[in-house]
């Protein structure tokens, strides 16, 4: 059950949004290990301490988009196109049995691989579909989108130890129909040296943690957040009712979060830096690179109030106007100082948030003044449906589904980074530490007020995207490119944007993240 606030519904105090279901998962998982009993106790206590004023409603099934008609989409429809020289592909013969679909793991030229995908043909699905893939020693369960028509790529990377050539694999489907007598195995050898410097580019505070906390934790990582997060919901109006004052407060709080929360992943505050540019403005800045763009909710044009949250010396905390050219210049400075071997950034084709899309554009423009090679790991925190990834906390993440009729998505490689239970726990509480992922002090304290249930305004606030469910998973998924590849990705994105009719700034999306 997901708990969602709604004015007019009866409400009561429960742990913070997402913590309820997540605690249930960790209670079951952690109780199996005697060495983590104290950690389980901490989880429960921290969850119960967070009294959140929200109303309980069961999670509603994700509706099939009206444009999707399973009869009009062929089962072999696949929007993904993989570079043939970047992975190893082989077809396998499927045998349909009463217990499920079975196949034999093939002999393949890639003897060492880190990521494995299995492409199966889905002829349609019901609500909450999932597919479980099992070997003799382990199994993984992946939840699919509700329409699930066409090729779906299942992530088998967690079964690596049980996938020797000749081993038997069983595929069991629930509420989804698998079609055909063949499937495709695709293996990736990324050969990433995670001991080398790693740079995470986050459009907003909390994006680095949602996408890549497991990957960046306990490494030589630098976290750079482009905006202060000074937009979105008016969470703190009890403390600051005037919009400019409110969003100045909210932006500063979130800027502080972006600097200190990575410490929970072993990254000290002097290696986390917030550039302080303005949330919800990147596309407007890109459209006129020299123009100074004010905040969404006020006249301020200086990023310095938000850079005061920084403690490191990556960039000076001095007055600087909010322009596109300044943003790109700052990213160039970051690249030259950090010299990363791996750069983690949004994928503008798969992430529907404008700030995420143009964050990728800014990074690629900065590459023109930084001539080193690097591996680029792209992510999406806002796939076309904010329900992705589907399924509960702790389950496996694979490629997001793409609406039929969308442009093809070219991928060089896929990289699945596994996160064990301890790392998932740390990620959970890093997310919970972010101000914008929990309810405000007024919303939490409203649990104690007699008229809580009679509020007629938008309190308790509805939080539509459950980032605790979506982000705390058995793995983090990335789309790996070389320098030329990521430049092509952004060039294709910009070409597609010239076809749209929306002027810059007309589509704000969810500016809160």
Q: Model-predicted segments: where are they?
A:
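Bacterial N-terminal signal peptides that target proteins for export
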Residues: 33-43
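C-terminal, well-structured subdomains that either form a transmembrane helix-short loop-helix hairpin
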Residues: 340-358, 363
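Boundary at the C-terminal end of the N-terminal hydrophobic targeting segment
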Residues: 55-58
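Active-site rim/loop-helix segments in enzyme catalytic domains that contact anionic ligands
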Residues: 61-338, 360-369, 380-382, 406-416, ...
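Alpha-helix boundary/capping motif
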Residues: 20-22
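Short, flexible loop segments at boundaries between secondary-structure elements
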Residues: 370-393
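Bacterial N-terminal signal peptides
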Residues: 42-50
């Amino acid at each position: 059950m997901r708990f969602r606030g709604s004015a007019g519904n009866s409400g009561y105090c429960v742990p913070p949004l997402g913590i309820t279901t997540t605690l249930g998962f960790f209670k079951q998982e952690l109780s199996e290990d005697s060495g983590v009993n104290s950690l389980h106790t901490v989880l429960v206590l921290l969850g119960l301490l967070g009294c959140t004023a929200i109303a309980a409603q069961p999670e509603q099934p994700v509706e099939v988009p009206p444009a999707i008609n399973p009869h009009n989409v062929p089962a072999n429809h696949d929007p993904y196109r993989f570079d043939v020289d970047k992975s190893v592909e082989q077809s396998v013969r499927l045998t349909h049995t009463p217990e499920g679909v079975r196949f034999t793991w093939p002999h393949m030229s890639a003897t060492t691989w880190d990521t494995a995908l299995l492409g199966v043909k889905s002829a349609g699905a019901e609500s909450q579909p999932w597919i479980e893939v099992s070997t003799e020693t382990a199994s993984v369960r992946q939840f699919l989108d509700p329409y699930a028509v066409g090729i779906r790529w299942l992530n088998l990377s967690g079964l690596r130890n049980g996938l020797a050539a000749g081993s038997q694999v069983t595929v069991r489907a629930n509420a989804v129909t698998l079609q055909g007598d063949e499937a495709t195995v695709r293996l990736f050898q990324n050969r990433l040296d995670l001991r080398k410097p790693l740079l995470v580019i986050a459009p907003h505070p909390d994006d680095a943690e949602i996408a890549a906390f497991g990957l960046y934790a306990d490494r030589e990582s630098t976290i750079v957040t482009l905006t202060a997060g000074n937009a979105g919901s008016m969470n703190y109006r009890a403390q600051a009712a005037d919009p400019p004052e409110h969003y100045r407060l909210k932006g500063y709080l979130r800027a502080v979060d972006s600097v200190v929360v990575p410490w929970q992943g072993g990254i000290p505050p002097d290696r986390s830096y917030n550039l302080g540019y303005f949330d919800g403005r990147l596309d407007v800045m890109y459209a006129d690179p020299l123009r100074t763009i004010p905040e969404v909710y006020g006249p301020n044009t200086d990023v310095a109030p938000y850079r005061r949250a920084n403690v490191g010396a990556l960039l000076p905390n001095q007055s600087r106007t909010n322009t596109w050219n300044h943003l790109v210049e700052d990213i160039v400075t970051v690249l030259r100082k950090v010299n990363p071997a791996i750069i983690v950034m949004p994928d503008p084709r798969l992430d529907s948030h404008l700030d995420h899309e143009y964050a990728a554009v800014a990074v690629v423009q900065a590459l023109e003044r930084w001539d080193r090679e690097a591996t680029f790991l792209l992510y999406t925190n806002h796939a076309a449906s904010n329900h992705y990834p589907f399924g509960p906390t702790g389950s496996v993440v694979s490629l997001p589904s793409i609406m039929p009729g969308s442009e093809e998505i070219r991928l060089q490689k896929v990289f699945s980074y596994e996160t064990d239970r301890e790392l998932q726990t740390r990620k959970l509480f890093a997310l919970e530490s972010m101000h914008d992922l929990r309810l405000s002090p007024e919303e939490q304290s409203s649990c104690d007020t007699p008229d809580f249930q009679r509020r007629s305004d938008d309190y308790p606030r509805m939080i539509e995207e459950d980032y605790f469910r979506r982000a705390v998973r058995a793995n983090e998924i990335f789309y790996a490119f070389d320098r030329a590849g990521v430049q092509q990705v952004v060039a294709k994105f910009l070409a597609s944007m010239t076809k749209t009719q929306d002027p810059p700034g007309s589509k704000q999306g969810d500016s809160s993240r």
